[in-house]
From Swiss-Prot:
This is Heat shock factor-binding protein 1. Keywords: Nucleus. It comes from the Eukaryota. One of its GO terms (molecular function) is transcription corepressor activity. Belongs to the HSBP1 family. It is found in: Nucleus. Its main location: nucleus. Negative regulator of the heat shock response. Negatively affects HSF1 DNA-binding activity. May have a role in the suppression of the activation of the stress response during the aging process. One of its GO terms (cellular component) is cytosol. PANTHER family: HEAT SHOCK FACTOR BINDING PROTEIN 1, HEAT SHOCK FACTOR-BINDING PROTEIN 1. The gene is Hsbp1. One of its GO terms (biological process) is cellular heat acclimation. Homohexamer. Associates with heptad repeats of HSF1 trimers and probably also HSF1 monomers, and with HSP70. Association with HSF1 trimers and HSP70 coincides with attenuation of heat shock response and the conversion of HSF1 trimer to monomer.
């Protein structure tokens, strides 16, 4: 087996380290983007829940909902 030149080993090491750093940077960027999108979705869901609750209040559904919470066994 031929010995590898120390200069060549240093070059390979540098290339691998650079590649790993680039990959880590890209994964960090993607992770930040995903977390940002999840936060946006969470805010949108909160807004939707609030709007639905407001619409239900306007329609008087909350009053009907309280009546429907009686277990079916007790309704008869």
């Amino acid at each position: 087996m031929a010995e590898t030149d120390p200069k060549t080993m240093q070059d390979i090491t540098l290339v691998v380290e650079t590649l790993l750093q680039q990959m880590q940077d890209k994964f960090q960027i993607m992770s930040d983007q995903i977390i940002g999108r999840i936060d946006d979705m969470s805010s949108r869901i909160d807004d939707l829940e609030k709007n639905i609750a407001d619409l239900m209040t306007q329609a008087g559904v909350e009053e009907l909902d309280a009546e429907n919470k009686i277990p079916t066994a007790q309704k008869s």
